[in-house]
Amino acid sequence: MNDTTLWAELLAYGTGISLSPLHIAVLLLLLGPKPVVRGGWFVIGWIVTALATVTLLLTVGHTLVLDMTQGSDHRTGLDLLAGGALVAVGVKELLRAFADGKNPPGWTRSIDRFVAMPLPLLVGLGAISEVASPDDLVLFAKSAAVVLAAGLPAWQEWVGVLAFTTGASLLLLLPLGAVLIGREKVLPWLEKGKQVLFAKGELVVSAVSLTLGGYLGWQGVSSLLLR
């Protein structure tokens, strides 16, 4: 795998994590009271959690000396598991989108309650939610696996971790940055973005999950064919 492909994969896996109902929570925080404080701390908690999780997985991989090269048992198993999990999530979100029709998804009510929580609880639950879902966990694991397989020196591993974290945080950082520059100017755009995500969020998550799941499944099958 060349460097360009590696960084592209890490950004893609990170983006898959950032596309969740929690990134809609940031829009709601920025539309509510104390937007910079509450939204800023939430995003900081998200970034720290992403950095800590992928760093921990890399440390475990180095300690156990796991072989993550293409065609190895560990890599093939992870690719097939991750691909299957993401395809399952994509199909579930697609079916849910059709079932909801024009009605707001059921999780929108949970998001409204979530963003009304006290700030420490909000940040803590956001961090837990980031690593609790199976689809996010397989993306964290896959990101650590491709870095391990590349056999990079330590400083380049850190670049890889930062690339992944950037992808995982980009959709949260963009609206926060826009509010820091000029909240009044971007409020209509944030409100419009919230409405679009409430209406189409499940379809977006489904498309990304199916795309990444199909790619990882193809990698797993390719590894099996190499044997």
Locate predicted features.
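Small-residue-enriched transmembrane helix starts and helix-helix packing motifs
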Residues: 1-19, 44, 107-132, 156-163, ...
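Alpha-helical transmembrane segments
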Residues: 5-7, 74-91, 156-170
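A small-residue-rich subset of transmembrane alpha-helices
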Residues: 10, 34-64, 141-188
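N-terminal signal-anchor/start-transfer transmembrane helix
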Residues: 13-32, 36
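Transmembrane helix boundary and interhelical junction motifs in multipass membrane proteins
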Residues: 18-26, 132-143, 172-173
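Membrane helix-loop-helix hairpins that form the core translocation module of multi-pass transporters
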Residues: 35-108
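Alpha-helical multi-pass membrane helix bundles of inner-membrane/thylakoid proteins
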Residues: 89-132, 188-195, 199, 204-207, ...
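Alpha-helical transmembrane segments and their membrane-interface junctions
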Residues: 127-146, 212-227
